[in-house]
Amino acid sequence: MFDVLMYLFETYIHTEAELRVDQDKLEQDLTDAGFDREDIYNALLWLEKLADYQEGLAEPMQLASDPLSMRIYTPEECERLDASCRGFLLFLEQIQVLNLETREMVIERVLALDTAEFDLEDLKWVILMVLFNIPGCENAYQQMEELLFEVNEGMLH
């Protein structure tokens, strides 16, 4: 499922391709690309839930409104988000790429992923997908994109 999301993000969203794609055509394109129908369905459902935030149909759980409060992760969240992922989320809050609300959106979308393995690089892409889809987060998206690509470019040299 995560592979389908990455493919969609890189092919349709990140490349600024036509964003209004017929769902049947999209499903066929993904099938032709070799993705499993169940993974396609789950990825599209995941994106649909993300779009609910964009349209104001869903709101992330608000655990605290005090920016100085500390987020305590549940055992399920700790299982999916290791210490490096949780530390990265805290770092993004401290540099104001994420706020309390967008952090909770990211965590909720991470937990909704149907994947056995999840690491820091995967988290970075989920953060990009969430920020891309939330109105008013354009600057945060740009900062996150710069963080992601600066680090990856630095690894190539």
Swiss-Prot record:
Q: Which family does it belong to?
A: Belongs to the Smg family.
What name does the UniProt record give this protein? Answer: Protein Smg
Under the heading NCBIfam families, the entry gives:
PRK03430.1 (NF002897)
Q: Which gene encodes it?
A: smg
**Origin species:** Escherichia coli O1:K1 / APEC
Q: Note the InterPro entries from the entry.
A: Smg
A UniProt-annotated Pfam family: DUF494
Q: What domain of life?
A: Bacteria
* Region forming the signal peptide: none
